[in-house]
């Protein structure tokens, strides 16, 4: 797992009703593929490989929102990814159980992104 100390510190300071869910999302991303790195961008955890893959913003209070910046470019059909725009997709997790239930599909999304970036 490519855990970034800056992100760990950010999470330690986070006062949010869904902090455990946000932490579970982070763990799921980092466990999905060893190529994934993380940082803080736009005041939220951002997951990267050959560019920004997704950010997990703490603004929503009823779910942990994950914005896949260029989600429309991720190869394959992924029910986890929602949205119809030209570029972005998003996923929402209401609780830790929903993160765990979506963990395998999230890993598929992450690997598809990483593989597509390696393929050029």
Predicted feature descriptions by range:
Residues 1-120:
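Charge-dense, helix-prone N-terminal extensions
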């Amino acid at each position: 797992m490519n855990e970034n100390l800056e992100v760990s510190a950010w999470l330690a300071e986070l006062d949010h009703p869904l902090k455990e869910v946000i932490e579970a999302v982070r763990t799921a991303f980092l466990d999905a593929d060893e190529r994934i790195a993380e940082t803080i961008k736009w005041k939220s955890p951002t997951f990267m490989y050959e560019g920004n893959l997704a950010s997990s913003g703490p603004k929503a209070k009823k779910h942990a929102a994950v914005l896949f910046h260029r989600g429309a470019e991720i190869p394959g059909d992924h029910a986890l990814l929602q949205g119809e725009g030209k570029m972005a997709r998003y996923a929402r997790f209401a609780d830790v159980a929903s993160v765990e239930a979506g963990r395998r599909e999230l890993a598929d999304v992450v690997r598809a992104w990483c593989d597509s970036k390696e393929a050029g």
